[in-house]
Amino acid sequence: TVMNNIPLVFWLIPIASVVALGMAWFFFRSMMKEEEGTDRMKEIAEHVRKGAMAYLKQQYKVVAIVFVVLAIVFAFMAYVLKVQNPWVPFAFLTGGLFSGLAGFFGMKTATYASARTANGARTGLDKGLKIAFRSGAVMGLVVVGLGLLDIAIWFIVLNAVYQGESTALVTITTTMLTFGMGASTQALFARVGGGIYTKAADVGADLVGKVEANIPEDDPRNPATIADNVGDNVGDVAGMGADLYESYCGSILSTAALGATAFAMNGDMQLRAVIAPMIIAAIGIFLSLIGIFMVRTREGATMKELLHSLGLGTNVSACLIAVATFVILYMLGIENWLGLSFSVISGLVAGVVIGQATEYYTSHSYVPTQKIAEASQTGPATVIIKGIGTGMISTMIPVVTISVAIMLSYFCANGFDMSLSAKSISTGLYGIGIAAVGMLSTLGITLATDAYGPIADNAGGNAEMSGLGKEVRERTDALDALGNTTAATGKGFAIGSAALTALALLASYIEEIKIAMIRAVENGKQYIDSAGNVFDPSNASTIDFIEFFQVNLINPKVLVGAFLGAMAAFLFCGLTMGAVGRAAESMVQEVRRQFREIKGILEGKATPDYGRCVEISTRSAQREMILPSLLAIIIPIVVGLVLGVAGVLGLLTGGLAAGFTLAVFMSNSGGAWDNAKKMIEEGHYGGKGSENHKATIVGDTVGDPFKDTSGPSLNILIKLMSMVSIVMAGLTIAFL
């Protein structure tokens, strides 16, 4: 009996993942049955689809090479140097494969859905909303379905292998944690590559089209429009999906590892603590589906009503999971189930608060963005100053929220035990992990609202280029404006969840170090602590490790690590900004060349060469993403080898603090500039084509790489540095 120790309730996990994938397939089929519209609409959708698929193909080629190289490195570390778990090379590959699949399915759906959404909007607003939202739901469900499936399969396999060993669960969870490396690497390329692609096209299209040639957005005369629309899919669907896939898996796996440690003394409780985060995620899938079916609206709905219908689905799912958590943890019989349930709720609430705060600072219904639009009366410089100021101030609420969530989830979990005993710390850390899982448990629907944005955006582009009637444009505009708000709150949510996940990963880093040291001791190594006694890693607590490695602020290694972490965040940002700048320059030159050399583009008589622009974006993105990506992987390895465990913990703390605040600042500045421009386009302060409008276009163009490249890429950086440290723990220990 291989499965005799797995409780029956565990099977909810694979069942939920299969249900999610089944429903995703159902939504995909029902979307494909809808009409795609006129021949012109079909033709434009085909252009975008080809471009998106060409990009994915190219990107996956590069990623495949990187994966093969890394898998060989891991295999060498595991089988030759024996400093790595032997399962890692395989787990790493499945993590990457599943994440890549999720991106592929999400993107395929989005590119098929845009024309159908535009066509649906010809009949009515509700029809358009449903097609776009349910197509977005395909992405959300595929991510949670594949993520949980990967986790469930590996848990069953490893459990069968290690069953009966005294440290079985610690070994299983620390092994599973390293698959996160596959999801992380995939996410890095999808987010950074996608971010560079989409903004090279967007900035190029805006600068030449709107500012120089005075043609509106999404005009078929602009050669970069198709690339711009492809970019929405590449960055916001595939990139966002891979980012949240990584947070989702990372939070569940690190929490399982923390649970194995927190309850190590009690075998039965330990197993329950390990599968608890997986079960919360599984129940979250069922509850997300309820929310997805609740999203609908009426004709002529106002923006407020539209937002309400999307918000209703998300909030109902969140409230249901809050209630369900109490039931799940009580039925699992986990000690202090009540406190842990409040940990989950603190994560859920933090997600909502950060989303709302993001909306406040970036939506033009509120003062901060209105003030930026007002500043356009004195030219672009004041618009930039105001936007940067707004972004910086906007970091306060998310940072305070995450801080409160950390404190609450930690102390609720350990029953407000202020003593720093080993038990209270490990239980508290488990609580923080559980909060991250809570925040991400309704990912099925929150990601659906995110992926909805680019689908609606592309539908608007399609309607504009196909020359559909005015009332259709008004409907797609309403859907698109809604999409921009959900995209902003979605970004806030992605950043918040990345921060909590990174924190849980940071906490589980010590577990990986512990396992690595036990492995080294088995191979005949002996550790002596500062007092000259033999240090035995196998029954040492988290505190003992912190003392053994002298992880405190008086240790210069920790301080230097923290400085390097903060610097890494800025360096990474700078590199991605520079990459967008360079890629946009080559795009601008290409668009100018076409206007010069292809006669009759501006009169609408000749068709521009869209393919060239798509190619430029694809090539730049591939070339430019290598350096920042390598940096993220190399820095933690070098710090581990030079400064040891203390240095790495400093690096991860500094990187998390700087990366989180920087990401919020960049995301919100960019979002506010974008919406200030939209506010003027709606007719305030002089309207379209005025000098004020041009000033806000400058702001929006600066904001593009802020909010869509550098900001979101930081989510990956803070998780990836923790992930790399975890995977390289064995190497760090070998050089002790």
Annotated model-derived regions:
Residues 2-736:
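Hydrophobic packing and interface segments
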